[in-house]
Structure formats: structure tokens, C-alpha cells
Design a protein with these regions (language model features):
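Short, basic/hydrophobic alpha-helical segments
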Residues: 64-116
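RNase H-like polynucleotidyl transferase catalytic core
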Residues: 27-34, 139-156, 172-174
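Extended, low-complexity cationic-aromatic segments
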Residues: 1-79, 83, 207, 211
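Short beta-strand segments
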Residues: 2-4, 118-123, 145-148, 199-202
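C-terminal domain-tail junction helix/linker
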Residues: 14, 182-247
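Mobile genetic element proteins and their domesticated derivatives, centered on retroelements
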Residues: 3-5, 44, 50, 69, ...
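Acidic, metal-coordinating catalytic cores used for nucleic-acid/nucleotide bond scission
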Residues: 60-61, 89-96, 120-131, 149-154, ...
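Active-site proximal helix-loop segment of RNase H-like, two-metal nucleases, encompassing DDE(D)
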Residues: 52, 143, 157-179, 190-192
Length: 247
């Protein structure tokens, strides 16, 4: 299974974050900047291995996205073992149809289908739904799985995008889109040298839970306790409360 998403746009603006500074000299960021364009990051993520394929672009039209995605998916398919040929056409179709169970609007499958080789999770955007692109996926044994409305967090490519953005841009002030693209692509190359597989509810979730427990150790908020604190009421307040006509 692979997941795909487009991150951005990233502006040529100062990005807050920590950085190496001499002792006693805090980092400074300008309050004004000039916008000279934006950059986006095309991302194809393999959760099982943690490896990511990226490409920085200044525009993300279908003419840019589809050729890159087809090229990267073809490379991913080439690395897979050969498909099993012992299954009948009916069994191949049943394997495809199994991934559409429960969908409100299932995709119309072509009459002829190759063996199912790869699952692709991507957002429900117009550029991902063009007939030519979807038919190309079917012809190469790729089943598209679209995230529901408001469920883009299910796309695990967004998790690796947050990591790449934080490592590449925080504490920097890029002045051109080329600088943003170079930083993001270099960060992705560094990540692929020692990738981390994605695990739902893994160590990151445990760290967040421990941090939440530290912040809210006494109750639902760090500013409250389990036991209410008694407070003496002034006589004037008691007099006003005793004479109010309603609750």
C-alpha cells in the first residue's frame, strides 16, 4: 500500500522554530517579507517501510501531477514480485470488488481487470478522479482508495509531510521557491537513509499521551483540581443574592 498527497503551498516567509544561535543572542525574524511565489511538495509514501518519494514543484496541475505519479507508481510496481497467474478472471475481479464493500458510491470497474497488485490511498480531489488517470490505475493493477470528506487525516502521507516540513523549514526564512524545494527534497533524501515505518498508535501517540497527562495531571485542565476550593462570600454579595427575583 502507498499513500499520495500534495503538501503546500509553502510561502517565501519566515517560519518560526528553534535554531542554533550564540549564547545571549536570541533569534530574530523580520516582521515584513516579500512574496515571490510558492512551492508544493508531491509526496508518495510507503507506510510499511517508511520510504517516501517526493518532488518539489511551483504548480500542481494535472499536467504536472499525473506524469510524476505514473512514473513513481510504475517504479514501485517494478519492485514488487510478479503477480500470481493461477487465479481466474472472476477471482481477480472479486479481489478488486472486495475493496469497494460499504462504499456509498463505488467506482465502476472496467470489464477487463489485471491482477490487483497495489493499493493507493489519496484524497478525494477532482485531479485524482479524472477518467484517464483512474483508467491508467486500473490498467496497471492499482486500486485507488479515496479518503472520505473530512477524513484526510486517514491519509498517512500527511504525517510524513508534517515531519518533512518541520525539519526543512522551521527556523528558516527562504526567499525563493527554489530554496523551499531544495530544503524539502534534501530533507526527504536524509529521511530515506534511515526511514521509520508508520504505525497507528505507535510511539508518537504514546509520547503525546504522556505529554497530555503531564499537562492535565489534576483533571480535565491544568488550571483545575479534583476538589473545589472554598471561597468566602462578601456580605454585599450575599444581600444581593438573597433579594434577586429570579434564579
Amino acid at each position: 500500500m502507498w499513500t499520495e498527497d500534495e503538501a503546500g503551498p509553502f510561502q517565501t516567509a519566515p517560519y518560526p522554530g528553534g535554531g542554533w544561535q550564540p549564547a545571549g543572542r536570541p533569534a530574530h525574524r523580520p516582521h515584513e517579507y516579500i512574496r515571490v511565489g510558492t512551492a508544493k511538495l508531491l509526496t508518495l509514501f510507503h507506510p510499511a517501510s517508511g520510504r517516501v518519494r517526493v518532488k518539489g514543484v511551483t504548480s500542481c496541475t494535472n499536467a504536472v501531477l499525473h506524469p510524476w505519479l505514473q512514473r513513481e507508481l510504475a517504479a514501485a510496481l517494478a519492485a514488487l514480485p510478479a503477480p500470481a497467474s493461477a487465479l481466474s478472471p472472476a477471482e481477480h475481479r472479486a479481489a478488486w470488488a472486495a475493496w469497494q464493500e460499504g462504499l456509498t458510491t463505488p467506482i465502476t470497474l472496467p470489464a477487463e481487470l489485471p491482477p490487483l497488485r497495489l493499493l493507493l490511498v489519496l484524497d478525494n480531489l477532482a485531479g485524482h478522479l479524472t477518467p484517464a488517470f483512474v483508467l491508467w490505475l486500473f490498467a496497471h493493477g492499482i486500486m485507488p482508495l479515496y479518503t472520505p470528506l473530512g477524513g484526510s487525516w486517514l491519509n498517512m502521507a500527511e504525517s510524513i509531510q508534517r515531519v518533512l516540513k518541520r525539519r526543512a523549514l522551521e527556523g528558516t526564512h527562504p526567499t525563493t521557491p527554489a530554496e523551499i524545494i531544495a530544503g524539502l527534497e534534501a530533507t526527504a533524501r536524509g529521511w530515506n537513509q534511515a526511514p521509520t515505518p508508520f504505525v497507528w498508535g505507535g510511539r508518537r501517540a504514546a509520547r503525546r499521551e504522556r505529554a497530555r497527562q503531564r499537562r492535565h495531571a489534576l483533571g480535565g485542565s491544568g488550571a483545575q483540581t479534583h476538589r473545589p476550593l472554598r471561597r468566602r462570600t462578601a456580605r454585599a454579595t450575599q444581600w444581593r443574592c438573597s433579594r434577586q427575583p429570579t434564579h
